[in-house]
Amino acid sequence: MASGKDTCPTLPKLTNNCSDESLYKSANKYEEIHLPRFSLKQGMIPRRYVMPWKENMIFRNVNLKQAEVCGIHTGPLEDSLFLNHSERLCHGEDRKVVFQKGPPEIKIADMPLHSPLSRYQSTVISHGFRRRLV
């Protein structure tokens, strides 16, 4: 029979050769990868447009400091705001903030299709007006 004490074999101690910083860097190495996002292609958007302050070499340092304070990306590889008729969405102002700056659009939900005050009694005009509001 076994004695009253349970004996467990002693396991060798492992040495910790990795520091906390190297563990943090290896865990976050995939967060540094950046994939640009673009909007859908539209004919009104230019083929390529670079913001003038990025090309102004006289006041370049001042412009870069101001952009850094505002939180605007100033990297060398993604200098164009528009590329191939698409807008770059990854390094811009948040869409919700942009929409809050403008005046709210008034939507008329109860507009009659034919108004007696209308000069043109066309369903095409009234449907087109409704389509713009939606």
From Swiss-Prot:
It holds the Pfam family SPMIP10-like. Signal peptide: none annotated. GO terms for biological process: flagellated sperm motility. Microtubule inner protein component of sperm flagellar doublet microtubules. Transmembrane segments: none annotated. Keywords: Cell projection, Cilium, Cytoplasm, Cytoskeleton, Flagellum. One of its GO terms (cellular component) is sperm flagellum. The keyword Cytoplasm applies. The keyword Nucleotidyltransferase does not apply. Microtubule inner protein (MIP) part of the dynein-decorated doublet microtubules (DMTs) in flagellum axoneme, which is required for flagellum beating. May serve to reinforce and thus stabilize the microtubule structure in the sperm flagella. Involved in the regulation of sperm motility. InterPro entries: SPMIP10. It comes from the Eukaryota. This is Sperm-associated microtubule inner protein 10. It is found in: Cytoplasm, Cytoskeleton, Flagellum axoneme.
